[in-house]
Regions:
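A conserved ligand/cofactor-binding region detector
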Residues: 2-336
Length: 336
């Protein structure tokens, strides 16, 4: 990944902090070392860029960098029978969202091009665009195990950012015409970072497939961060009748009635579609939001919240050993 000013010295200096890998010469590295080198630099810079030290049920988030590859454990729980459920908030290039969505054992909600105002989307693309850090050479098969020549990589970066500039230009023109953001935002998606909340009891196959050298570099980068976060996180024991509650802080549990806590948690997971989780919020509004969207059939956020089953091998939806909040209410005829 590169800073916009690096890619073309005629471009204005973007606002915000320089990216942490600007001084790494990826051109001089073998292809199989590029992603590892970038991840190592990101981890080195954790203390310099700061972390959100807020604990959610005793779990401290793993936060790597703002608007770059990032993984944060929001909640990590284990049942008395040993079934583990983990919820993460991850940030990755939107270009791999389709691949991320192929994993059916994941429950997920993510930032929506239909929900986020086009002005904010354009600002994101201008200030912090996604730019590939690995430029694979055209060849047969799915994996590019060799980069293009060093002198061509800078041209590739400049061409990519030229495409970004054109996308912004035409998005702005469509917005002026009064076109809805659900259409205009599509022009910007190749250059966007995607934020998603993912919950699962089954991670091994994902880690095996997506951390492989054959995986697309962008997918491998975020998958390795997710695997590391999963390995170092220590789950809290949750008993039957209690709940796995992403985004509900320990101190909030003293204020929020126990019967409302699952709805508050699910409501906050739903809000990832259009707001940052660190934004100030009112738990009453989160509860009401969740209950309202559930009534009209938008129930995917209710999958992140779950309570242990007595049998750790029993399935509830796509979770094993945990019953999802979604499964506690009858499904409408039309569901999302």
């Amino acid at each position: 990944m590169t800073n916009m000013n690096q890619a073309n010295h005629d471009r204005p200096e973007p606002e915000g902090n320089p990216l942490p890998w600007d001084d790494i010469d990826t051109a001089a590295m073998p292809a199989d070392q590029v992603v590892s080198a970038l991840e190592a630099r990101l981890r080195e810079d954790i203390e310099n860029i700061g972390r959100d030290e807020t604990e959610h049920d005793g779990v401290k988030p793993v936060e790597i960098y703002d608007r770059a590859y990032e993984c944060k454990v929001l909640a990590d729980s284990v049942s008395p029978e040993g079934a583990r459920l983990t919820t993460m908030e991850v940030t990755f290039p939107r270009i791999i969202l389709a691949e991320m969505n192929t994993h059916r054992v994941f429950s997920r909600n993510s930032a929506s091009s239909r929900a986020i105002p086009i002005k904010k989307r354009i600002e994101m693309v201008k200030k912090h665009p996604y730019v590939p850090e690995y430029w694979g050479k055209l060849q047969k098969w799915m994996a590019a195990d060799e980069q293009i020549d060093r002198e061509l990589r800078q041209q590739a970066k400049e061409t990519w950012l030229d495409a970004r500039d054109h996308a912004v230009k035409y998005a702005e023109e469509l917005a002026i015409l009064g076109i809805h953001k659900q259409t205009v935002s599509r022009l910007l998606e190749p250059f966007l970072w995607q934020v998603a909340i993912i919950s699962s009891t089954e991670w091994d196959n994902f880690f095996r497939l997506r951390t492989s050298p054959a995986a697309q570099p962008e997918m491998r980068a975020i998958a390795e961060l997710m695997q590391e976060a999963h390995e170092i996180s220590v789950p809290n024991e949750v008993k039957p009748g209690e709940w796995h509650l992403p985004l509900v802080k320990y101190e909030e549990k003293q204020e929020i009635p126990s019967e409302d806590q699952p709805w508050v948690s699910a409501g906050r997971c739903a809000r990832v579609s259009y707001m940052k989780q660190e934004d100030e919020r009112d738990w009453h509004k989160d509860r009401d939001l969740c209950q309202n969207i559930a009534k009209i059939g938008h129930r995917s956020p209710l999958e992140h919240v779950a309570t242990p089953l007595e049998d750790a091998s029993e399935w509830s939806g796509n979770f094993r050993g945990w019953k999802q909040l979604r499964k506690t209410m009858p499904e409408p005829s039309s569901q999302t």
